[in-house]
Amino acid sequence: MTNKKSQTKPLQSSKQTNGKDLHTAQTGAQVLVEHIAARGVKHLYGVPGGDCSLDIIEAAEKMGISFILTRTENAAAMMACSEAELTGTLGAVLTTRGPGVANAANGVAYASLDRVPIVFISDGYDNNQASVSHQRFDQTAMLSPVIKGALRLDDVTALPAIDGLLDLAISGRPGPVYIEVTAQCMRNTILTGCLPVRIAPSTFGPPTVEALKLAHGLVLGSQRPILVVGLQCRDKNVTKALRAFAHKLQCPVFSTYKAKGVMPEADPQLSGYFINGAAEEETFRCADLIIMFGADPVEFPPTAFKYGSTKVLEFTNAQFDRCVYQPALSVAGDLALAAMHMCECVRPSSWHAEELRKIKTHMLTRATANEGGPITPQLLVETSCHLMPADTRCTVDAGVHMLSVIAHLQSKDPYDLLISRGLATMGIALPAAIGMAMADPQRHVVAFTGDGGLMMCTAELATAVELRCNITVVVFNDSAITMIGLKQKSRQFERVGMDYGHTDFAMVGQGFGCQSFRATTPAELEAALRNAFAREGPTLVDAVLDPTAYRHQMLSLRG
């Protein structure tokens, strides 16, 4: 096994090993499945091949793990990621070698940069097949930049290393690990008692007393701090402690996109979303301390940090190789403990309630996208939010439409919205919605996607239909990759390569058996959404909109 970050932790025996007959033999496939089942895996997503995949699927079904056949390997990884994010457990993906691995690479990169623990399983060749070239390349080498570790199971003697690799996926900064299996290992047997399932606890140590004292001093010495909360705060214990800290401090709170819901939208302290852009600049110029709490560098756009002259206090559960800002102090350790300690000593800042109200109003105004029509991006989001069932969760694809969704969707808790921010990949809203629906079938999921993103994963509508997922796909249909088109225009280039031909996604959805509706006017939009939300199973609303408002919105928010 090759690990990029080795960590030594005490081991705890899982209860699943109790009562095992030491003389019972299991195949390698059964052992592998047992070990991922012990991590809470309920679904195995993928597109199988004709070799070891079959052994693993058979073992999984017998152990209560359902194999979910997807249309693409990339989407399979995205579904596994969204289920893992929502449940806090390990996600699992299975593909064949060669093209299966290559096609899954984007989804694995998403797991890496968006900090999601998944295990990616694919088959390789047995050691006695050295002469074979068909579908052969160094799969581990290809995945190496985006995985935390890898393990090749070419013999049953390698099976004891599985737990260490799975521990690696969930420890520190979560991420993907890769297991390459062979027929020799998957089909041969080993005595059950030789391989008890052992799971190392995944916890962060407390921050040092010295670091907390220094942090107390920085906060007490500031009059107008601003709190920025990031993806590491989505753990329920961290969220609870962070909210208490924020309320004690009584300062503006800005969220990253992935942390949406950590502070409820209705909270008067939640001012808006930090993107190092133009909209929040006026507020940040008034701050004498920026507290980055649980923010990950992958969440920030690749632009120079605007506030280098303002002290930055960082709280993080893991140190980073690179970051857009240089903190005056970095406090590493358990974030819930850090927030509780800070809450004990801080006092309310000098920000007034009326200032907080004005900042919140200012940020919402800057996010307005109501120019043109008849259907504008803001109208589409606001109408969807007004009509969607209570407690609906959402996903949003990469693209300019996400600006309206982030600004106007009312989230109460972490994971009410899922977005790819680290990789910022297109084509994720639909697969992520399927994964969320599989993890929690009782809550409806809305996938907000542009037409470009949907065309990258359209076939997964068939997957949603077969699984009878309670999802609604809302399509921002403007027949273009609009965000890139706006950047092209800002550089005064001729418009080339930005426009798609017209697509009727309602007809496409119907072809897959998905109940689909089309809207070109506000009245049609309301009727389509009401129809979609009233039905069981997957639905789609194809909203033909005017993209005119995007240009002003982009300039207003980002500059």
Predicted region positions:
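Phosphate/pyrophosphate-binding active-site segments
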Residues: 2-23, 180-181, 192-194, 308-402, ...
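Cofactor-/ligand-binding subdomain signature composed of acidic, glycine-rich
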Residues: 2-39, 149, 157-223, 343-348, ...
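Glycine-rich, acidic loop regions that bind phosphate or pyrophosphate groups
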Residues: 5, 121-162, 258-356, 488
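N-terminal cofactor/phosphate-binding cores enriched in small/glycine residues
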Residues: 25-109, 113-114
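Active-site diphosphate/adenylate-binding microenvironment
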Residues: 29, 37-39, 49-60, 359-431, ...
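Structural signature of the thiamine diphosphate
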Residues: 42, 85-95, 99-122, 145-195, ...
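Glycine-rich, anion-gripping cofactor-binding loops and their flanking helix/strand elements
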Residues: 72, 85, 231-315, 412-442, ...
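Thiamine diphosphate
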Residues: 129-134, 322-323, 332, 339, ...
